[in-house]
A protein has these predicted regions:
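Tight coil/turn sites that cap or link beta-strands
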Residues: 22-24, 58-59, 67, 88-90
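Glycine- and acidic-residue-biased ligand/ion/polar-headgroup-sensing regions
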Residues: 35, 39-45, 89
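A hydrophobic/aromatic-rich effector-binding and dimerization subdomain
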Residues: 1-16, 69, 73-116
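Short acidic-glycine-tyrosine-enriched beta hairpin
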Residues: 51-65
């Protein structure tokens, strides 16, 4: 069985990044111990999550559940602009109410294998 590297860190309840890259190195499959939301703003990008590949278009929103193996595939030097949210699992659980599951978008993406 292949071992994937855990990457990234989250010392707060959440972090938000706005990134633009036009010459990115190849990124290997990896996972995080927090949830990730990615909003694709531009770029010629595919995103692989748990064995499924999604071709992204501007304004696509990608949900990556904590622990899911994923990686972006950057196809060319078109600027890859995105907003990324890292969200602690505990943070969502702390604010969850009986009739309001804040992690439902991540659970549904995983269950339905439809992350975009």
């Amino acid at each position: 069985m292949h071992k994937y590297e855990k990457t990234g860190y989250l010392t707060d309840n959440f972090k938000i990044f706005h990134l633009i890259d036009s010459d990115m190195p190849e990124i290997d499959f990896h996972f995080h111990d927090f949830h990730k939301i990615l909003i694709c703003l531009s770029g010629n990008i595919s995103y692989c999550i748990e064995g499924r590949t999604y071709d992204l278009r501007p304004n696509d929103i990608v949900f990556v559940n904590a622990g899911e193996v994923h990686r972006p595939i950057i196809h060319d030097t078109t600027p890859y602009e995105r907003i990324i949210f890292y969200i602690s699992r505990n943070y969502l659980e702390d604010y969850q109410k009986k009739d309001n599951d804040l992690a439902l978008c991540f659970k549904s993406a995983h269950k339905n294998q439809s992350h975009v």
